[in-house]
Each structure stands twice: as C-alpha cells, then as structure tokens.
Amino acid sequence: MYGKSSTRAVLLLGIQLTAIWPIAAVEIYTSRVLEAVNGTDARLKCTFSSFAPVGDALTVTWNFRPLDGGPEQFVFYYHIDPFQPMSGRFKDRVSWDGNPERYDASIFLWKLQFDDNGTYTCQVKNPPDVDGVIGEIRLSVVHTVRFSEIHFLALAIGSACALMIIIVIVVVLFQHYRKKRWAERAHKVVEIKSKEEERLNQEKKVSVYLEDTD
C-alpha cells in the first residue's frame, strides 16, 4: 500500500515538473530579417523573456553563419560584462547595445560589408532558465535599401496629408478672395448710389433755382 502511494506521488511530481518546465524556458524575439546598406551600421535587435529573475548568471551569445556556408563564427559574448572578439572579421566591429534589466540582448554591428550577409543567432541563458529556441536574424547587406510596404504606406499617407493641406489652403484663399470681391462690389454700389443721389440733388437745386427766377 505504501509502495503504491509513493509511486503515485512520484508520478504526480513528474507531471507537475513537466507542466512547469516549458514555462521556465527563455523565449527570444528578433526582427528575423534585416536589410542594411553597405558601409553603414546596424543594430541587431534581440529581446527575451524569462521565468526566472535576471541575475549575474545571465549569459548572451551571438554567433554567425555565413550565407555561402562554412563553420559558425563567434560574434559576441556577454556575462556581467561584454566580451568582444579578439580576432576574426568582427574584431573592433561589434559592440554591446543591450540592457539585461530591460530584457534586451541587442548588439551593434559597425561598417557593414557584403560578406556580412548571413544568419546571426542570439542565445540567452538565465539559470535556471537555460532552454529555449535560439533567435535568428537574416542580414542582407545591399547597395541601397529597397522601399518596403511600410515606406510606400508612409509615402501615401504623407502625400494624402499634403494634398489635404493644399486643398484647405486653396479653399481658404478662395473664400478670402470671394469676400474681397463682394466687398469691392458693395463699395462700388454704394459709391454709385451716392453719386446718383448727389446728381439728383444738383438737378433738383437747379430746377428750384430756375422756378424762382421765373
């Protein structure tokens, strides 16, 4: 009887640990795809979430897989302090731009070259959270950045706003011009009436004078 109870307790504990363990995995978030111009700098953004509080045990590892194949290359390592590569293509070309307290493990890559094309991996371990999917960013170094759908949308919105502003300005100017024309016409009408009244008065005076002389 005691043996069966112990077995059930162990099984129950195993089920509970299995249910808890996936929650404890570190989750990585990246832009997945990044396009940058040759010779410029790029921020490789990598953020994460962890079940455990961030502490001094946290480590961040960045590696690189070339587009044309070949062995994986070391890019950057962080553990309390940043550690830059002492040799290789990324020497003096990479810097830490993250903040573990804000769950940010990003880096900056300087002076991009065409042979930097490839996949950059971001791995974060925050014991006891050491499992999880490694984040990836596929970097494409190009001569010029192509317009994306967001750029076209921003351009369309900007053009529409500019058109609306122009229409409003035209309407305001037209209304102002129209009021000015009406004011000028009203002034001319008043002036004509005034002259006509003055002429009639003069004629009346002449008529009265002639009658008196007769």
Swiss-Prot record:
GO BP term, pick one: cell-cell adhesion
A GO CC term assigned to this protein in UniProt: plasma membrane
Mode of membrane association: Single-pass type I membrane protein
Regions of this protein lying in the Cytoplasmic compartment: 173-214
Residue ranges annotated for the Ig-like V-type domain, each copy included: 26-140
Glycan attachment sites: N38, N117
InterPro entries for the chain: Ig-like_dom, Ig-like_dom_sf, Ig-like_fold, Ig_sub, Ig_V-set, MPZL2_Ig-like_dom, Myelin_P0-rel
Matches recorded under CDD domains: IgV_EVA1
Extracellular side: 26-151
The protein, known as: Myelin protein zero-like protein 2
Species in which this protein is naturally found: Pongo abelii (Sumatran orangutan)
